[in-house]
Regions:
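C-terminal ends of transmembrane helices
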Residues: 18-32, 72-91, 124
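Membrane-interface module
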Residues: 20-28, 94-97, 108-124
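Cytoplasmic-side transmembrane-helix entry/capping segments in multi-pass membrane proteins
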Residues: 32-45, 64-70, 86-101, 118-121
Length: 124
């Protein structure tokens, strides 16, 4: 059952993703000719997926967590490949690397290490 502590961990994971996504939008990474895939909603969902993966790891459901993390990573890789297919795109993978870091911070928050995840988000 989802208790208040787990909900707080998941909420932290979503807030981390949301903060990173808002920063990416504000700095112009999602707009223009070289716009990337991730905005506030995308990064919030990636943080939530990571949070759920961390929660499943706490419940000893490592396979479910691995599927969630692998699926999020495949999504990021597919977005990068799609961006590189555009003829006017310069090679840059900053947004994609940050997306994978957001998933990792979500996992950290989902495991219960909210302070560590939040401090890492402040550095990103």
């Amino acid at each position: 059952m989802l208790d208040l502590a787990i909900a707080g961990h998941l909420f932290t994971a979503v807030l981390i993703g949301l903060a990173v996504g808002i920063e990416r939008e504000w700095s112009g990474h999602t707009h223009g000719p070289d716009g990337r895939f991730g905005g506030a909603r995308t990064f919030a969902l990636l943080g939530l997926v990571g949070g759920f993966a961390g929660w499943f790891l706490r419940l000893d459901h490592a396979l479910t967590a691995a599927v969630l993390i692998g699926g999020a990573t495949l999504f990021v890789v597919a977005a990068y490949r799609a961006a590189m297919q555009r003829p006017d795109t310069t090679p840059d993978s900053t947004t994609e690397v940050v997306a994978i870091v957001v998933v990792a911070m979500g996992v950290t928050a989902g495991l219960g290490f909210r302070t560590m995840a939040s401090a890492t988000a402040a550095l990103v």
